[in-house]
Amino acid sequence: MIAAGAGGLLARGTTAVPAAVWAWAAAVAFAVETGCRAAGLVHDPAAFAALRLVVVALSLCPTMALLGAKRPQHGVWQFIVGSLAFVLAMPAVSATLVRPGTMPDVHALQRWFMPLLVVVGWMNFAATRHGPSAALVAIGQLLLLRPFLPFAAEAAVGGPLSAGPMSEGSISDGLGAVLVALGAMLAAVQSVAWPAVPRAGLQGRAFGNDRAAVADPLAAIGGPFLALRETLGAAWTLRIAERFNAVAETRGWPCRLRFTGLEMGGDPHDTSWHRDAIRGGRALLRRFVSDDWLRRHERPPRLSAEKCPEVAPAGEGR
């Protein structure tokens, strides 16, 4: 819960905040499930399975929230995310209200869809600096999802969830929870201690960073683009790069956005295209972030490409 809250603070000003809220909700649900099991408030294996399915449904919401994180529809998209969570948890609701005492009847398609969504969430960040964190979270999610994976025996849904503290299911649950928490905390610590872009912060304001950024595409576009890549993952940043590069090619700008940052070519003394390129790049970025966020993640003024190898060439683009 702490890591999810920290993620929400770090993502403020972006459309990734709802994903952090969903992650916090999933953490609360898992804490409630764990508390009920520890206090002995729930004894029925079917009730354990229903609670776990609700936790799993909520844990998949952050990935879906990120896939729709573009303004202006990102707010309405949360209703779709909530509907998905309800549909995934429907077998638990049905078993509890309609057939009390029976195991949730999870359809085979849902058993395949849930781990597929976990893999999609991992792939979205696999090529970013948060790749190791995403891998830890994905493995932990699969362990928590284990009773509802394809080909899982129905007995495994009730047995491990209701067994003793040293049972195979309890150990798997504990390991899964630890991996998810570790991955989330690692991502939060990495974002604070090792940001993708040296933040301009007070130094940038003191030296007129806003004015410098107007003349420097590396500061105005490359820096925020890399920071957004670490926040939203590959899906949207590659789309931003594709749109920017299409406009750049049409208008003859000697620059291209790659997954590793902004590549600039041509005559270094020719700045006639800078203002238009910055305006176009910022327009694309504003679909996901606020102006204040853009200012916070611009590179410090006069920071050369040689001092920022991750923004300058090169790397493979889309």
Region locations from a protein language model:
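Membrane-anchoring hydrophobic segments
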Residues: 1-88
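Alpha-helical transmembrane segments of multi-pass integral membrane proteins
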Residues: 22-29, 77-92, 136-147, 217-219, ...
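Juxtamembrane segments at transmembrane-helix boundaries
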Residues: 40-44, 59-136, 148-162, 173-194
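Alpha-solenoid helical-repeat scaffolds
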Residues: 53, 109, 129-132, 211-215, ...
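Soluble, non-transmembrane domains of integral membrane proteins
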Residues: 200-318
